[in-house]
Structure formats: structure tokens, C-alpha cells
Amino acid sequence: MKKKNIFVLAFTAALGLSSCDMDKDPYTSYPMDKYMVDVQQFVDARQGLYDPFRTMTTGAATLAPEFMTELFMPMVFFSNTYGDMSSWNIEEANGTIETIWGNYYTMIARANYIIDSYERAKEGRGEFTEEELQKVAVIIGEAYFVRAYSYFNMALLYCDVYDKNQAETQMGLPLQLKYEPSQYAEKYPGRSTLAATYKQVLEDLTSAKSMITSEKSLNYISQHTLQAFEARVALHMKEYGKAAELSAALIGTGKYPLVKSSEDLNNLWLYDEGSEIIWQIYQAVPDEVGGSLGLPFHGQYLGASGYPYAAQRPDFHPTTALLELYGDGDMRAGVYFRQYTLDQWGVPNMFIYTFNKFPGNPLLQKSGLSTDNWYTNISEPFMIAEQYLIAAEAYLEDGNAPEAAKYLNALRSSRIQGYVNETFSDTGDLRQAIRDERTKELVGEGFHFYDLKRWKLGFNRSDTEQVTGVQLDVSYFSKLEIEAGDYRFTWPIPKAEIDANPQLKDEQNPGY
């Protein structure tokens, strides 16, 4: 292989793992109809792996599943944003479902393009030294993670709950593992088994672990990011011993201590800073900002008194089913919720609790963020609190109740002032306590829908409004009752995808 060194310094600088490295030329600066032939192209293409996370961790992929649960109720004047999801009007032609499917496959295509380019480079196509290939390998590891992350999240939505005893017959996802844009429909893949889908996720994760060298990094995928993700995957696969081991080991590094004060907890969600963050998606005003997770919980426009004390007109408000989970001294109650004046037409102003976990980062606002996107925060796909909850649940289901209680009590001690460790003589009580704690801690982050699905639980929204008359009093919203195992817990393969891919013709999910 020809020796060349002109890109080594540039590449080394680009992998310096500082947040300013994210400020690069757009991914599309290199056309995807030809493979990359030098190191700088890999460096620039790296941006295309990270860009989609700003959308996929702050938009519909997070909020749509959350609004399908009992935790949030539409307001009487809501804009019908996510109305079909909240009412469980789930159809094959649903635009939200189609968009999320397409966005994940876009991420997969970008990952495939980079992985395939690397394989061609190793074959001697292009001018790369062995040293350069080793440096490029970090980016390839990130591409493997992106593909694993995308297929895993799609499996949670578009496939049944993983069951190792049935996975060989459960329907999985169409696995596209090469960058092969084709106009020939007969070349499109059909659905794999769910066993094959999860096998691919784990294989990609193994590849990523062998290539990504940084142990800890705020804005870049690190070994700790991979470990947190692997623990999450293991929990959903019911590999409880593995999940417990991974999460406990990550906690045991001591790199991500739980915050101890309400001020620090508030800063974690207001300013998006704190010791609990494992991986944070880089954002910068004006062009590198994600979606506004807080917008549906507050309303688009600010009143005359300005942020944050204006009267609110939100699309959704937290239900009493959620609010009543928080007891005395729980610091999350004062951070995740705030009492505002409700601005409702024809009704005297009244107080109501809004969901305030995503209040809008003032640093983004001061940088020139439009008021239409005022309630925008920087997303953190992996935080240490989730690992405490994984450890607690996994240890319990693996038969180690004392360890489960230890991690539950550790998280509670950091969140509840004056907390005294609780002992549990009944496994059922401990299981319910862990599930309640998971709901309280992770609310709004997109987990609860998947939790109900894998726990095989339903819900009933009846009589959960905060104030009579402010919720949308329509039976399929406010009186909605969903039974455990409802077929709509598994989303349909989008109609447009089935129409375009003949291999999917007879592979739609049951019920659609």
C-alpha cells in the first residue's frame, strides 16, 4: 500500500473529541454514489453519523411513544399534535410512523456507506497507510454503533417483544447491511426473524467495542456509551444477568455520580450539565439545534410577562396518575413539574401543573434561538440514572433481590430528601417499587411505552385529569383504556414501505 501522510495531522486533530469538532461541513459535501478514497472524506463524513441524533432524540421518536401512555392527557384546546398517537389511531399510513421508520433507515444507510468505504479501503482501493486505517477505524466503530442503535430502536417499535424461546419465528426487520441504493424492487430485503435482528445488533455492538477507544466522552460515542447501550439491549432481551453486570460495572467506575441537591438536579435539566450525563448530543445555534421537546408541554408563544412565568396553553398536561407517584421530599417533583397559570379561552385563569423537564436551555436562547423553539434542550440519550434502574430490575429478575434493593435505594437517596433505605420482604412489592421509580425518573424521555409493552401491562386514562374541564373530554383521549398485549403496542410497517418493497407484501404486523 502506498505510503502517504498528508492527512494524518488533520485526522488526529479532528479526532480530538472536543465539542467544537462537531462544527464541520455537512455530510452531503461528499456524494454517496461513490466511495471515499482518502482520510479527510471519512473525517467529514463522520458528521453525518451524528447529525441525525439531534432529530431522533428530540422529536417524534421520543414524544410519539410517550403520548401513547397514561402519563399525559391532551388539553381541550390542543392543536392535535400527536393526536393520532394519543388516541391510538394507529394505521399503516400514519405519517409519524412512516417518518420515524424512514429516518432510522437513513441513519443505517449512512452507516453502511462508511462501513463499506472502509472495507474497500482495506482492500487497497484508495491511498491509505496502515496508520490511517487504524485512525479511521474509530469512525467505523461509530458507524457500527449507529446501525446497532437504529435497528434496536426500530425493533422496539415495529416488532413484538423479544422472546428468546420464540425469536426464531418472530418477525424482525429488513436487514440492509450494505450500501446498495437500488431502483430494482426485487433486490429489497424482506423481514428477518427477530432473532436475526437482535443478533445483528449485538454483532454491530461487538464491532463498535473493538474500534472505539475513548473510555469517556461527552459529545462522542465512547466505550461507556456502548456499555450503557449494551445494558439497555440486554434488559429488553431479558438477559438479566448480563444487564445487571454491565450496568453495575458502569456505575462502579465512579465516573458518573448521582447529583445530590435540587439545584444540581435542576441544572441537569435546565442547563443540560451535570455529572450524570454519559453521552450528550452536540447542539449549537442556529443551524445545529434539535427539536423542542418541551413545546407540547408549554405552548408555542410566550405571554407578556415572558419566560418562564407566562400563562401557558399546552397541548398535553401530566395526569394525576403521574403526579401522584411523587411523594414528600422528592426533588423531581419540583424540577419535572411547575405550576403555571392556564390560559384557556372563556375560562378564568387557573393553576395547573405542566411538565417542566424540558424548560428550554437559556444558553441556547441567549444564542439567538427563535421563540418558536424556546423550549429546546440538549438531548442526553444515555444517563447514569437509567443504569441504576436497569441494575435494580435486572438483579431482581435474576433472583438477587438484595442487590436490586441496593440500587433502587441508592437512586432514591439521591432524589428524595431525608430518604431512609427501604427493605422489601415481598418480591412483588419490590418489583412494583422499581417500576414506579423507573416511571418517575425517566418520564418524558420515551421509555414508558416500551416498558408497558415489555411488562405486558395496559392502562386506563379515566379520571386522571388535574382539573375538571381542561382535558379534551373525548372518550378516545380522556377515557382511553388499553389492554395488555394490544396489537397496537407494535407499530405497523409503513404502507409506503410495503407498497415499494414486494418482499414485505405478506409480512405486515398482525392487526393491520
Where are these regions (language model features)?
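Flexible, polar/acidic helix-loop-strand segments at domain edges
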Residues: K187, Y326-M383
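Short, surface-exposed recognition loops and adjoining beta-strand edges that mediate ligand/DNA contacts
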Residues: M32-D33, T62-V76, E127-E131, C159-L173, ...
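Membrane-proximal, proline-rich intrinsically disordered regions
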Residues: C20-F72, G299-D315, L322-G327, V335, ...
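Conserved, well-structured interaction surfaces
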Residues: Y82-Y158, S192, L205-S214, D372-S379, ...
